[in-house]
């Protein structure tokens, strides 16, 4: 009987340890920031929202007020009349951890049911491998999301669009209620990472780019593999139920989630980050100015 009890206790202990391990792994996969912590072939930048405008220099260039309201993140000069040169000239005044990231990042504004705008809490922009990617071409423009109003069940690694609680899962097609865990809500937008090798933009701002296949290869039509860019944008609200985006016209709240990216970085530093971090298989999360990991 003593041996049987000992065996039973051992089995229960092992089962408990296995369950704890599975829960820990599930949490790490579900966490926007934690999922990337300790990974290699990645660099990231943390930025703050700098201003809001009904402008879109990719979709409506040169036409102020022609778009829905956007949260412009990082570069404080971004507007309808922005150019590559005006964006790069903002170095020294951007709201990012590294002043070399003068890139263009923007997402639709989020509103409460009463019409009050929800501020952006913080944003992380991840650039991931695997190793062997090409440099993101200067002046590349692209839009991700917005055209997929009924996405499949989003996950951390599949599906270009999702909502979650900060540092927690699961992932949803609409903003969730995170009050039970005391966390704000977060939007995730995954950009395509295969370029056609020719066009820096296209009429729909999407066709010159494609997502890689399930085999992690680029289609023949878009053979140039560049870093996978992911926006993780946290909003300062815990209960996202009933919130809606400025782009949600006649669709359920949050399902028009999309984002715009414009490569107006300091190109020399961006090249260093791609070479040293992604292609060098290093973890360069939270890049700073004069970051030793780029040396």
Predicted regions and their residues:
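Primary mode marks residue(s) on the alpha4-beta5-alpha5 output face of response regulator receiver
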Residues: 36-67, 71-189, 196-295
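C-terminal region of N-terminal signal peptides and the immediate post-cleavage residues
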Residues: 24-42
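N-terminal secretory signal peptides that target proteins for export/translocation
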Residues: 1-9
């Amino acid at each position: 009987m003593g041996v049987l009890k000992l065996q039973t206790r051992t089995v229960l202990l092992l089962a408990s340890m296995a369950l704890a391990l599975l829960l820990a792994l599930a949490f790490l996969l579900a966490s926007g920031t934690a999922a990337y912590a300790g990974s290699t072939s990645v660099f990231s930048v943390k930025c703050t929202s700098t201003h809001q405008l009904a402008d879109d220099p990719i979709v409506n260039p040169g036409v102020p007020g022609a778009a829905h309201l956007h949260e412009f993140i990082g570069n404080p000069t971004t507007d309808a009349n922005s150019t590559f040169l005006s964006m790069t000239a903002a170095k020294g005044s951007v709201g990012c951890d590294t002043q070399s990231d003068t890139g263009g990042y923007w997402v639709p504004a989020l509103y409460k049911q009463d019409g009050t705008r929800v501020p952006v809490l913080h944003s992380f922009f991840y650039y991931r491998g695997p190793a062997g990617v090409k440099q993101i071409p200067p002046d590349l423009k692209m839009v991700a999301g917005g055209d997929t109003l009924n996405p499949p069940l989003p996950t951390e690694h599949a599906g270009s669009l999702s909502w979650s609680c900060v540092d927690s899962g699961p992932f949803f097609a609409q903003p969730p209620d995170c009050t039970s865990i005391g966390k704000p809500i977060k939007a995730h937008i995954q950009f395509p990472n295969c370029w056609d090798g020719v066009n820096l933009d296209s009429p729909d701002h999407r066709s010159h780019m494609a997502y890689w296949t399930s085999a992690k290869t680029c289609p023949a039509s878009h053979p140039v593999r560049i870093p996978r860019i992911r926006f993780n944008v946290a909003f300062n609200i815990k209960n996202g139920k009933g919130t809606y985006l400025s782009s949600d016209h006649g669709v359920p709240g949050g399902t028009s989630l999309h984002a715009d990216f414009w490569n107006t970085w300091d190109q020399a530093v961006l090249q260093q980050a791609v070479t040293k971090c992604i292609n060098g298989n290093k973890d360069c999360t939270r890049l700073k100015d004069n970051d030793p990991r780029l040396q």
